[in-house]
């Protein structure tokens, strides 16, 4: 369990170190959420593409991607089955309905993961804000102390 730190007892360099650590944690959590959103978007797009697979589109011509910028002409001859990339180079054949369920489960899982990370991110933001406010107070105190000492010497 993480230990509790009273930030009022920390000096300016310690507060700076704590702020830097919180910056790194906020960056990590933000990056994690962004990556999860990218993957989730891919699953949403894949699920939406399954709506094109219906009997009225069977036999229609289409462009099949060979790379991200190269396509070959093809015909849609099976609207009942699809191959799904399940990771690490493995593909599974599923019916269009099973594929929709698969993508829905993936989307829901990623949504739950983002919902778990979001509170931690908000907590780190709040902690960082508190540290920055304390740093500002300490700097003001040091400035006032320096001004008082300068006035006393004069």
Swiss-Prot record:
Q: Which residues carry this modification: N-acetylalanine?
A: 2
Q: Which Pfam family, an example, fits this chain?
A: Prefoldin
Please report any disulfide bonds recorded for this protein chain, giving both cysteine positions: none
> Sorted alphabetically, which keywords does the UniProt record give?
Acetylation, Chaperone, Cytoplasm, Nucleus, Phosphoprotein
Sites bearing N6-acetyllysine, chain numbering: 42
What InterPro entries does the record tag this protein with? PFD_alpha_archaea, Prefoldin, Prefoldin_subunit_alpha
GO molecular function per UniProt: amyloid-beta binding; transcription corepressor activity; unfolded protein binding
GO terms under cellular component: cytoplasm; cytosol; intermediate filament cytoskeleton; nucleus; prefoldin complex
Tissue specificity here reads: Highly expressed in pancreas and skeletal muscle and moderately in other tissues.
Q: Which residues carry this modification: Phosphoserine?
A: 56
Q: What is this protein called?
A: Prefoldin subunit 5
Say which species the protein is native to.
Homo sapiens
């Amino acid at each position: 369990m993480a230990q509790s730190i009273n930030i009022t007892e920390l000096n300016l360099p310690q507060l700076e170190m704590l702020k830097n650590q919180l910056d790194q944690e906020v960056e990590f959590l933000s990056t994690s959420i962004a990556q999860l959103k990218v993957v989730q978007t891919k699953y949403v797009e894949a699920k939406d593409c399954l709506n094109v697979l219906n009997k009225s589109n069977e036999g229609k011509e289409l462009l099949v991607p060979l790379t991200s910028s190269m396509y070959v002409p093809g015909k849609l001859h099976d609207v009942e089955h699809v191959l799904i990339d399940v990771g690490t180079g493995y593909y599974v054949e599923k019916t269009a309905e099973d594929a929709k369920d698969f993508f829905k489960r993936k989307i829901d899982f990623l949504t739950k993961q983002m919902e778990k990370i979001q509170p931690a991110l908000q907590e780190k933001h709040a902690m960082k804000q508190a540290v920055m406010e304390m740093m500002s107070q300490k700097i003001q105190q040091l400035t006032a102390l320096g001004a008082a000492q300068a006035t006393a010497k004069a």
